[in-house]
Amino acid sequence: MSNYNSWGIHMRSGHCWHSSFPVKKKNKRSSKIPMNEKNLDLLNRIFKSGSEKEYIKSDILNERKFRKNVQDQNKIKSSPRQKTSKLDMHKKKEESVIIIEAGAHAREWISPAVGTYIAQQLADPANSDLLKYATWVVVPLLNPDGYDYSHTDDRFWRKNRRLNKGRPECPGVDLNRNFNIKWAITGSSSNQCSETYHGTKAFSEKETKAIRKLIKRIKNVELYLSLHSYGQVILHPLGYTSDEPPGVGELRSMADAFANHISNNGGRQYAVEQAGLNYQSGGGSDDYAFSRGVPYSYTVELPDKWKDGFETPPEKILGISQEIWTGLKCLLGDLVPDAKYLC
Ligand SMILES: [Zn+2]
């Protein structure tokens, strides 16, 4: 990424904050770059353009309401009684962490829309019970400058917008080919002009470095979801080979449970398959998270199967977001049995 920081929303048992991910250390005392005017301008444009415009119009994503909800959640957190009950509940077991990464590929607009919807639901005090059983980390837009470019210049842009040395006419790295897991082995390109250009080395990009840092820093990540489109399929590791990983049965049964939760609650039918079954690619975030010990790591190719492609009609945004959210709430009960009643 050349111009902007990735940003994340991190919610843990009642508190939430927007943050810029740590980037290149210029000053040893502070590894974070604050949200500056340039970034804020980009975010404002993102939330007022393209598919998100429909959110604002229909009051699904109401910024004022979102801010108020976050404040309310913070009040809950600061209540001593709440703290005690949380401690009692989890004194035997470390809290599970769920990471949701959205918007790695610029043109897949439904992905950040769903990520944003999930963040909004988590900030709603009506859903505060969900924060009792897991720490949720939402990265609603991993590739902001690519996403912006897909609104302003090229609807089907996929990569980020970094300038590639020696080829100014061919910018961009495919973020989902840049992770250090079988990097550049298969399903990516060393040609900077290619849509699947994997970068000069693994983790050459700020965005992928930020995810690496997140996964390394946070212990006990139980579930990692990478939201993409399209295909209406839940893909499990391994993606770089068609060989099955150890523990494939568990990976598959959790993915089947997710798909069933979605369809049993009135949502679409999502297929489940191994990512590398028909097409192999190295350097993906799902395989990376899995290689770092995350037991349940998936890429969700959001709807539809083929007709809409990347151009999800705005009227379908809410339905897709709701079905993923419902499936996720139920899936929490499979990860943390005490949370089954939330389904
Ligand atoms: Zn994608």
Which positions does each model-derived feature cover?
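Short glycine-rich, acidic/polar surface loops and turns
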Residues: 275-298
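Active-site/substrate-binding loop(s) of hydrolase catalytic cores
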Residues: 94-256, 260, 264, 299-312
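Short beta-strand-to-loop junctions in surface cap/lid or active-site-entrance loops
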Residues: 85-94
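His/Asp/Glu-rich mid-to-C-terminal helical/loop segments that flank catalytic regions of hydrolases
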Residues: 309-343
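Intrinsically disordered or highly flexible coil/loop and linker segments, enriched in small
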Residues: 184-185, 267-268, 337, 341
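Flexible, glycine/charged-enriched surface loops at secondary-structure junctions
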Residues: 129, 268-276
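Mature extracytoplasmic/luminal segments of secretory-pathway proteins
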Residues: 10-13, 190, 340
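Extreme N-terminal flexible tails
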Residues: 1-24, 28-84
